[in-house]
Amino acid sequence: MSAWYSISGTVRVRRCPEVDAIAAQIRAHCDRDFAVNLVPMDAEVDEFSIEGTGEFGAGGVLALDELLESLGPYAVAAAVLTGEYENEPCELVVAPTTEAGATALSHHRLDQIKPMLRELTAQDRESLVTLLREHGG
C-alpha cells in the first residue's frame, strides 16, 4: 500500500555534522521528488528546507516524519512544516522541546484563524470571546 504525501517548510538548525547526516538521510529517503536544502545563515546556523510531493510505500511517510522530527534537538527555534497526507491537510512540528513545539503549533493555529475572524458577525465574535474565557483563554 502506498500513500501520497506533500510537505514543505523551513527549520533553522545549529550547524553540526549530525544535522548534515540527517539532511543526507532525508534526501536519500525522498529521492528526486523533494527539494531538500541546507543553507548557511550565519557562522553557527543553517536553514533546513524541504518541499515536495511524492508517493511512499508502507511506512515511508512515518519514516520521513521521524527523520524530520529528529532535527528537533538541533533546532534553534520550533517550526511547523505543512503539507497533505492522502489529500488531508497535515502539520509536522520540529522543535527543540515539547513546550517550544506546543507554542509554535499554537502560533500556527492563530495565524490560520486570524483571516477568518474578519468574517464573523459581532454576535459570533462575542460568542467566541465567551468560549475562549470558558476554556481558560
Residue ranges and their predicted role:
Residues 25-137:
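Charged interaction segments
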Residues 1-29:
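Short, extreme N-terminal segment that most often corresponds to the first beta-strand
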